[in-house]
Regions:
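Short beta-strand elements in bilobed, periplasmic/extracellular small-molecule ligand-binding domains
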Residues: 41-51
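Conserved beta-loop-alpha segment that forms the PLP phosphate-binding cup at the N-terminus of a helix
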Residues: 1-16, 28-31
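Active-site PLP attachment segment
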Residues: 122-166
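Active-site phosphate-binding strand-loop segment of PLP-dependent enzymes
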Residues: 44, 55-108, 134
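Structural detector of well-ordered beta-strand residues that form the stable sheet scaffold
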Residues: 21, 46, 105-107, 128, ...
């Protein structure tokens, strides 16, 4: 999950003053990648704190909505928070963020194979997951979903080599 989501964060075309939104409860390595991007490009990280016992989905959606500004480029949200096991209202968060022109990247490290859902139904732009946790595949196996409309705008962080035939 970390490597796949790092590819998105590092692959975006960041400019000074761009903003990212994420939560205190997000995985530490993801927070550190946003810190690296901030140091390198002068971006701003807006950090929210998800309550352990929210009164409704709307409380969580509002939390993220209130952190978004006209400079917000990417919102990262955990599908399931690893500390508490909370499953967040991803579809509602994506709809809200998209209404504001913000892309959404979902950390789904604990979800694929744990419970049933459809990435298409969530409406996110990016979804990364660790597959070894619930699918009994080798440690380190993961996946990254990128919505078709964003593929061409992500910079590859690994070079590839194509040798011409002949």
């Amino acid at each position: 999950t970390t490597e796949s989501l790092d590819m998105v964060i590092k692959g975006m075309n960041w400019e000074q003053g761009d903003e990212a939104v994420y939560a205190q409860q997000d995985y530490g390595a993801m927070q550190m990648m946003f810190e690296q991007v901030s140091k390198r490009y002068g971006t701003v990280n807006r950090i929210v704190s998800v309550p352990n016992h929210p009164s409704s989905d709307e409380e969580i959606v509002s939390l993220y909505q209130n952190a978004i500004t006209s400079k917000t480029k990417l919102l990262m949200v955990c599908h399931m928070i690893n500390i508490t096991g909370q499953i967040l209202p991803i579809k509602k968060i994506c709809q809200m963020a998209h209404d504001k022109g913000v892309q959404v990247m979902v950390d789904g490290a604990h979800c694929v194979g744990h419970f049933q859902f459809s990435i298409d139904d969530l409406g996110c732009d990016y979804y990364g997951s660790s597959l070894h946790k619930w699918l009994a595949v080798p440690l380190g196996t993961g996946m990254l979903y990128v919505n078709d409309k964003h593929i061409d705008s992500l910079w590859p962080i690994f070079a590839e080599h194509h040798k011409e035939p002949g």
